[in-house]
Amino acid sequence: GRWGSFIAWLLDRLHHEVTLHGRKNSASMQRWIGERRNDLIELPESVSLSTELSCMENAEVVVISVGAQDLRALMGEIALLSPKNKIFVLCMKGLEMPHGKRLSVVASEFLSSSNRIAVWVGPGHVQEFYRGIPNCMVIDSEDEKTKHFLVDAFSGGIIRFYYGQDMLGNEIGAASKNVVGIAAGFLDGLSLSSLKGALMSRGTHEIAELIGALGGNPFSAYGLCHLGDYEATVFSAYSHNRRFGEAFVRGSPIMSLRRAMRLHALL
């Protein structure tokens, strides 16, 4: 998808050896192979392309960007390769339905203890990054060395990375901002955009309480994983969640919206 190809583009610019993997039956991957571009950017020849998951076997870091509800199936395929001593970075925001499992928990079910898991969350749209507009994001991991290694390895481009201090809170905050984005779209669709300030204020407070109730640090909700992502989610014309809420309020059928915007789950 757009986010995964952006990450490949970004890490290549940081002089890492990058391979972009996609499924054989993926139309977007076939376009990358045929044209080395999508509607936004062209990938240089220095980025390798592969439809074989075995391409990750020699990688030190595996960055994953798929739909939250697709992670379990992908991790099942990865587990068949018996990876060892790798860092898996999850770059999507959501919870696994129907039980609300955090994505790092899902990934951990398939990996041996020799591997490490990190999350990459925070604001940003690829359309703006490609235009050179910078932003700040968070990398978090239960393993301190992994966290510092990734921030050092991924820094130096158009994203300023911060060290996360609460993996549970950062994952819950990032997933929950999707719901606030949809609510913001409702307000836009009802011509009640002036209420977005109240939505952001009350929404952040309630998500802070949720994080605390789940065992995380409530103050994480006020960081880049949630409140810091509101501009990109609540106001931006690129926000899928906001656009979904606005179109739904104006009468578009929910199933057609989900197909058009590739939204498989809202949280």
What is each model feature region?
Residues 177, 184-185, 190, 212-267:
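NAD(P)-dependent Rossmann-like dehydrogenase/reductase catalytic/cofactor-binding core
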Residues 1-51:
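NAD(P)+-binding Rossmann beta1-loop-alpha1 motif at the extreme N-terminus of oxidoreductases
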Residues 1, 23, 66, 91-94, ...:
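Fold-independent oxyanion-binding glycine-rich loops
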Residues 43, 54-57, 61-134, 150:
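Rossmann-like NAD(P)(H) cofactor-binding subdomain of soluble oxidoreductases
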Residues 70, 81, 106, 110-116, ...:
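Internal alpha-helical scaffold of NAD(P)-dependent oxidoreductase catalytic cores
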